[in-house]
Amino acid sequence: MKLISAIIKPFKLDDVREAVAALGVDGMTVSEVKGFGRQKGHTELYRGAEYQVDFLPKVKLDIATSDDNVESIIEAISKAAYTGKIGDGKIFVYDLAHVVRIRTGEMDGEAICKPVKPMVAPS
């Protein structure tokens, strides 16, 4: 089992959600986060005063899935989040030791998203 964490631009969230939903991913956790990388911050003007914004708003999404689904989900996120500009984001993949669905007591593979549909190239 794996946990896929993606940091993306906020305006790309709907595109990414639709892309992974098309694969059959039926759940994810979304958090509003701030950060910077190569993009750094930027300068803004507010009431005539200039100030530096060091941390930029981003969205983090987490998807728990089986090992077999990882590459398809990464590909879907990468395509949907892509703008070609600095700050598109990053995808991290972590090992999951144990998962429990609180409501039912289901564990591990039964408690995470079902197998995804293979990605088919549009014709």
Regions inferred by a protein language model and the residue ranges of each:
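Positively charged, small/polar-rich N-terminal and surface patches that mediate targeting and assembly
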Residues: 1-123
